[in-house]
Amino acid sequence: MITGATAGIGRATAHVLAQDGHHLILTGRRRERLEALRDELARTYPKSRFLTLTFDVRRRESVEEAIASLPDEWQAIDTLINNAGLAVGLESIHEGDPDDWERMIDTNIKGLLYVTRAVTPGMVARRAGHIVNLGSIAGREVYPGGAVYCATKHAVRALSQGMRQDLLPYGIRVSLICPGAVETEFSIVRFKGDNQRAASVYDSYTPLSADDIARTIRFALTAPAHVDLQDILVMPTAQADARTIHRTPKG
């Protein structure tokens, strides 16, 4: 199961795992985009099967109802990729919009918890499973204007550690993937559709691609059963930390 499957890292991960022959439950808020992705994957990877679930991870009842509605043959989820997440705004704490804060907290923390709570009882019963949480360099450092987003990703890191402790007796692995700068719709969402400002985030250096992170997720999933790649930090070569990027002007 991949949350936030319709764009960016989620979409790229769906392609990489389908290529490997996995059967995928694709989830997201946008039904049309989910169905288009499903159809595209089915044409490209005919040996894999695909199911879509439309829900907003922020709505606990919707999450629970959607996962409970899975047909019997799709109930045994062996891998959960908690990819849904976002940043909104880059204002100082005294200027930030509380609605933006709530959107980030509800998606990045509560949404991850709702989906995990709905899926993990089955893993526990089967005494097997793998959870992959999408963290961020922002879960290790804090940068100006990013206080709330960074706090949510610090929470994801703490939750990942707690999940490992709670699920350890059941043979369930928990991997945290922490990207640096990845060129996706992330900055367009953060800057509320300001494409020029979003593009400037990735100007004059080569950022990571969604496919880079998808392949990192594959790497974690394909480790031997006795190996848990618990915490992976993935950065562009041009990025040293959350605030230090070496930009080489063109020309």
What are the residue ranges of the model-derived segments?
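Active-site helix of classical SDR
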Residues: 116, 152
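Conserved glycine-rich cofactor-binding loop
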Residues: 6-8
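Conserved glycine-rich Rossmann-like NAD(P)H-binding loop of the short-chain dehydrogenase/reductase
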Residues: 22-37
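The beta1-alpha1 cofactor-binding region of Rossmann-like NAD(H)/NADP(H)-dependent oxidoreductases
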Residues: 32, 54-65, 98
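Substrate-binding pocket helix/loop in short-chain dehydrogenase/reductase
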Residues: 91-93, 100-102
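Residue(s) in the substrate-gating loop at a strand-loop-helix junction
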Residues: 136
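C-terminal helical subdomain
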Residues: 176-180, 184, 196-243
